[in-house]
Design a protein with these regions (language model features):
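NTP-dependent small-molecule kinase module
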Residues: 1-30, 135, 139, 152, ...
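P-loop (Walker A) phosphate-binding loop of NTP-binding proteins
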Residues: 41
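Post-Walker A helix-loop "phosphate-sensing" segment adjacent to the P-loop in P-loop NTPases
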Residues: 54-63
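Conserved nucleotide-sensing/catalytic segment adjacent to the nucleotide-binding pocket
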Residues: 62-64, 69-123
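Small-molecule kinase domains that catalyze NTP-dependent phosphoryl transfer to phosphate-bearing small molecules
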Residues: 108, 113, 130, 159-193
Length: 193
């Protein structure tokens, strides 16, 4: 998403990035590299915020998008659990995290990926902030944004690929909100117009 100085969405995301970096800097003195979780419904601005945080991160950092992990359009919960088990838990334990990316074209698992324990980690995606994952992160962000704005941004970004799946995905997000209460676990809540 292009960011302009007079755009209220850009301003909200820049402010959230500044606050997230301040929280992450407090964790830099711990033995494990800091972990940031970014959750919010589709189109809230998670990917853009992750890029803003990574751009000013003080050291090596890796952004992992759950879009590369979800096993298809019905895989929100499974993608979040995969991130917790295969990325967050090993990283927090000081081990290299290893996982397989999802190949959306072939509809199956694809290439392997990894991140070392000394690298800061930003994991962004709907469903990532749960009670179990919250314990594995230093900074936990929930992005709140009106449904109409989110839908417009998401469909502008992904167009006809996403349009037939919007309601299906939103239902999985509803389940996540009801079961996991991600806003409750957030150390930072950002309101994005």
């Amino acid at each position: 998403m292009p960011l302009s100085a007079d755009d209220p969405v850009a301003t909200a995301l820049r402010d959230a990035a500044t606050a997230a970096l301040a929280q992450a800097s407090a964790a830099l003195s711990s033995p494990a590299a800091p972990v940031v979780l970014l959750d919010g419904r589709s189109g809230a601005g998670k990917t853009t915020l992750a890029a803003l945080i990574a751009a000013d991160w003080p050291g090596p950092v890796r952004v992992v998008a759950l879009d590369d992990i979800y096993p298809g359009w019905d895989g929100l919960a499974q993608g979040a659990e995969t991130a917790r088990e295969e990325i967050l838990a090993p990283h927090r334990a000081g081990r290299t995290a290893r996982w397989r990316r999802w190949d959306w074209s072939a509809q199956r698992h694809g290439e392997s990926d990894a991140v070392g324990p000394g690298t800061g980690l930003i994991v962004e995606g709907s469903g990532v902030l749960t009670p179990a994952s919250a314990a594995l992160a230093d900074v936990r962000i929930w992005l709140e944004s009106p449904a109409g704005s989110r839908r417009e941004r998401a469909l502008r970004r992904d167009g006809d690929t996403y349009r037939p799946h919007w309601e299906r995905w939103a239902a999985q997000e509803d389940t996540h909100l009801a079961l996991d209460h991600p806003r409750h676990w957030a150390t930072l809540v950002a309101e994005v117009p």
